[in-house]
From Swiss-Prot:
Component of the UAF (upstream activation factor) complex which consists of spp27/uaf30, rrn5, rrn10, and histones H3 and H4. Interacts with rrn10. Component of the UAF (upstream activation factor) complex which interacts with the upstream element of the RNA polymerase I promoter and forms a stable preinitiation complex. UAF seems to stimulate basal transcription to a fully activated level. The keyword Transmembrane helix does not apply. This is Upstream activation factor subunit spp27. The keyword Hydrolase does not apply. One of its GO terms (molecular function) is RNA polymerase I cis-regulatory region sequence-specific DNA binding. InterPro entries: DEK_C (IPR014876), SWIB_domain (IPR019835), SWIB_MDM2_dom_sf (IPR036885), SWIB_MDM2_domain (IPR003121). Residues 55-122, 194-233 are annotated as: Disordered.
Length: 233
């Protein structure tokens, strides 16, 4: 699984870390590598959490260290032995190289029109009532939930990844607490796929001015041939 570590860290650098789930990261990794990794779900989830911890911002790291002192001690010991410090430059070099090789592929993966996660889904009656909408994509749904969570200060002060549900959230999820990595698991039962033929059609892009090859035959001829005496008589 270690061969996917660089890809996972790059993916975590392009998503909203407060709303993304391990499942979403795994799906994006499968799209990037063009492989089916469902058989390695457990190992991949552990690697995703490891990469999430290693790339956390200082405020995130402080919270993570409170929850996992054993992991912190292990990392410190590796640094003192020189192992961790010796590996870091190689990882940065490899990351820069792969950035150049896979830059085009990453851009394609980020195209919203080609991302299945951005398709609208039908919300359950309770979720629709809570959000005031009947259809939303999964990322939009998670974003609105986090807007509500932050507006009402529902994050556990000891671990910002844990949400302390108020009465409204309890009525939707039917639990007292949620974890940021399990929120999408609950949403799976509250959102239904919409058949492709029932999805709203994308808005057409602004049409560009017609090129000379697109002009009518007579106009095109006038562009390349000067008028003759007969045509001007």
């Amino acid at each position: 699984m270690e061969e996917y570590e660089t890809d996972i860290k790059q993916i975590l650098g392009t998503v909203d870390r407060q709303t993304v789930s391990a499942k979403q990261v795994r799906q994006l990794l499968e799209e990037r590598r063009k492989v089916d990794l469902s058989a390695h779900k457990k190992d991949l989830n552990a690697l995703i959490l490891k990469c999430f911890d290693e790339t956390a911002a200082p405020s995130e790291k402080e919270s993570l260290e409170k929850q996992a002192p054993a992991r912190k001690t292990k990392g410190k010991r590796a640094t003192e032995n020189g192992t961790e410090e010796g590996k870091k430059p190689a990882k940065r070099t490899r990351k820069r190289k792969e950035d150049g090789e896979e830059g085009g592929k990453r851009k394609r993966n980020q195209d919203p029109a080609n991302n299945p996660l951005n398709k609208p889904m039908k919300l359950s009656p309770k979720l629709a009532e809570f959000l005031g909408l009947e259809q939303l994509s999964r990322p939009q749904t998670v974003k609105k939930l986090w807007e509500y969570i932050k507006a009402h200060d529902l994050q556990d002060p000891n671990d910002k990844r844990t949400i302390l549900c108020d009465d409204k959230l309890k009525s939707v999820f039917e639990v007292d607490t949620l974890h940021m990595f399990t929120m999408n698991k609950y949403l799976t039962n509250l959102m239904t796929k919409i058949p492709d033929d029932q999805l709203p059609k994308p808005q057409p892009k602004n049409e560009e001015p017609a090129a000379p090859n697109d002009l009518p035959k007579q106009e095109e001829k006038e562009l390349v041939e000067p008028p003759t005496a007969e045509s001007t008589a």
